């Protein structure tokens, strides 16, 4: 018992923390927000199309492909819900594509659970150890 106490005391005396605190951080006075190429870029330059077509980020955002609330030119008849489903016509899956699992061939369908499997799920498998049998 005393040996364990002495061993623990020795471990705590030698232990040094892994975290080194470097002190309070300082905020730079000037922050450059101009577009920069990624440091791992092979060409070390931005694409020419980016610089020529987008003067600011807000201009880029206006021209970016958006399908949500960022797009400013949303029309009521565009996108999902713009026209009734009847106007879309019949929806048929292509050859080899199935919408429902029950449309698949028999070998790919879900197998029904046996009573033993249902019992194992409901009891957490405890009855299998009690009965001495496994699935």
From Swiss-Prot:
GO biological process, one term: 2-oxoglutarate metabolic process
Keyword Hydrolase (UniProt): no
GO CC annotation terms, alphabetical: mitochondrion
Chief subcellular location: mitochondrion
Subcellular location: Mitochondrion
Name of the protein in its database record: Alpha-ketoglutarate dehydrogenase subunit 4, mitochondrial
Family membership: Belongs to the alpha-ketoglutarate dehydrogenase component 4 family.
Gene Ontology molecular function: oxoglutarate dehydrogenase (succinyl-transferring) activity
Tree of life domain: Eukaryota
Transmembrane segments: none
Matching InterPro entries: Kgd4/YMR-31 (IPR020373)
Classification via Pfam families: Kgd4-YMR31
Signal sequence extent: none
Subunit structure: Component of the 2-oxoglutarate dehydrogenase complex (OGDC), also called alpha-ketoglutarate dehydrogenase (KGDH) complex. The copmplex is composed of the catalytic subunits OGDH (2-oxoglutarate dehydrogenase; also called E1 subunit), DLST (dihydrolipoamide succinyltransferase; also called E2 subunit) and DLD (dihydrolipoamide dehydrogenase; also called E3 subunit), and the assembly factor KGD4. Within OGDC, interacts (via N-terminus) with E3 subunit and (via C-terminus) with the complex core formed by E1 and E2 subunits.
Function: Molecular adapter that is necessary to a form a stable 2-oxoglutarate dehydrogenase enzyme complex (OGDC). Required for incorporation of the E3 subunit into the E1-E2 core of mitochondrial OGDC, and acting as a stability factor for the fully assembled complex.
Keyword field: Mitochondrion
